[in-house]
Amino acid sequence: MGISLWLCPYGHSPEYETFKTLIESLQTLFPNSPVFEPHVTVCSGLSCENMEEVHKVLEMAHHAINAVKSKVDSENALVEFDGFNIGKKYFEKCRLECKPNPMLYSLAKLIRSMFVGELNIDTWLFEEFHPHLSLAYSDIYPMDQAMIRLIRQRIEDLFDVTTEEIESHSRDQDAYKLQHTLKGWSFPLTFKVVRCEGPVEEWEVLSEVTVHG
């Protein structure tokens, strides 16, 4: 993954603490699963050779999100979730899926085009970009039905929502729909540029910026 841009709830906000609690709760179900902070990856594989370029990424993200701030309100959050997946792969083990949002897609497209140099940017955006909030990383597979029920129960209890299994678009994942959209977060929010290399415990936040409402 190299260097990535994360979109995070503001530290110690109610939203941050809620998602952090869920991540820590699910971690107890997966032996040796690392703890990490709540985040949605906007773009990975960024070309950042020095701190000046890291700061350029944050500056661009800051300006871009400020430009759409007027479109964000209590009825139109920047980050929302409408489903969750349980997968085979380590980094796809359990995650909340973001509800499609033009503002988030525009941000990802901008950062990808400027700091990755993607030639087929629209193909990447609509075929490979799947914004989500990871809840657990693990090599455990397969998972028995009792464990899956427990994961669903913890999500349902925390957010007071019911879940329904639906047909998945991937053989490697089981997909579930949430009865109603879960509000994630808007402002304040924090962008972080993170070096995602080696074990998760060794990932390093290179720099960050908080954007207030």
From Swiss-Prot:
Its Enzyme Commission number(s) read 3.1.4.37
EC main group: hydrolase
Give Gene Ontology CC terms. Golgi apparatus
Write out the entry's keywords from A to Z: Golgi apparatus, Hydrolase
Pfam families hit by this protein: CPDase
InterPro entries reported for this sequence: Cyclic-nucl_3Pdiesterase, Cyclic_Pdiesterase
> Active-site residues?
39, 132
Please give the family membership noted in the entry. Belongs to the 2H phosphoesterase superfamily. CPD1 family.
Q: What is the designated name of this protein?
A: 2',3'-cyclic-nucleotide 3'-phosphodiesterase
